[in-house]
Amino acid sequence: MDSKILMSTSIIHISDLHFHTYPQNFREWKSKRILGATNLLFRRASQYPLQRAKQLVAKIQKMNWDHLVISGDLTQLSLEKGFSLARETLDPLLKDPQRVTIVPGNHDRYVRQAAGNDLYNKYFGEFFGKSEIHLRRLKDDWAIVGWDSAHPNNWLSAAGTVRRSTLQATENLLQNCPAETRFIIVNHYPLTFPEGWKFDKFHELYNLVPVRNWILRHPQIRLYLHGHIHENWLHRLPRDSGPELLLVNSASSTSKLYSEQKSSFHQIDLEDGNVRVSPILLN
């Protein structure tokens, strides 16, 4: 009889919260924020009332979970007041940094910031760390690896890049962990798209294909959690050998519901090598 005691782990995955404020002075109205603030005024602000975010926090507080993942776009315009509002609202969920993983999205690096003044790092850096990759070890031989692929772009681009140094650091980690370790990658950008989706290279990862191929070559990577495109989904990618890759999109968790929407975020339960992904609707 197998005497091994199975331990389960539950992850809450939310994304693209888009906390927003408007620029308050001329310095904040720089470059791309003009375009973003216009979009916010005429469209996004009405889609993201603060009450929805508070409702999300209250719902998660009542759920049973071991780890919280936020896969980017905490803010809309990467303004300090936006980050401050995000931190204040999410604070009830962030009491134990060891139970939280947060990676930045393109809206969190919306414009170039002065050296040493990265606002994502100021308000949420403790949930990523100062290394090239973020690492959190979970129960039962599971581990979370967070990537930072967000960087400022020109006016017409919202793309990101997974750096070679990020892939190398992850490669080194995989090689030095026990063979039975299973990994979850958290990154802002998707690797797959819904059927019929019109791909835009200026909106996705610049190096999407090589990154996706790299992940598929490493069967110990079992899950890829992301956001960016505001449609929840669970996709599956087969491998030539080894278990399939599950890709979970939880964007956008705080937006108003659209017609026939079935999911706002996901709860992911891990038990031994088994994965169960449950969609959760924020009514």
Predicted feature residues:
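N-terminal active-site segment of His-dependent metallophosphoesterases
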Residues: M1-F83
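A short C-terminal boundary segment appended to hydrolase-like catalytic domains
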Residues: M7, L270-N283
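A general structural motif
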Residues: S8, N64-W65, P97, P178-R182, ...
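Metal-dependent phosphoester/phosphodiester hydrolase catalytic core
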Residues: I11-I14, F19-Y22, L35-T38, T101, ...
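Active-site neighborhood of phospho(di)ester-bond hydrolases with catalytic His/Asp-centered motifs
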Residues: H13-S15, H67-G72, R99-N106, D148, ...
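Active-site environment of divalent metal-dependent phosphoester hydrolases
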Residues: H18-T21, Q76-L79, N106-A114, P152-S157, ...
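Extended active-site neighborhood of metal-dependent phosphoesterases/phosphodiesterases
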Residues: S84-N172, C177, P210, S241-S250, ...
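Conserved beta-sheet core of the metallophosphoesterase superfamily
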Residues: D200-E271
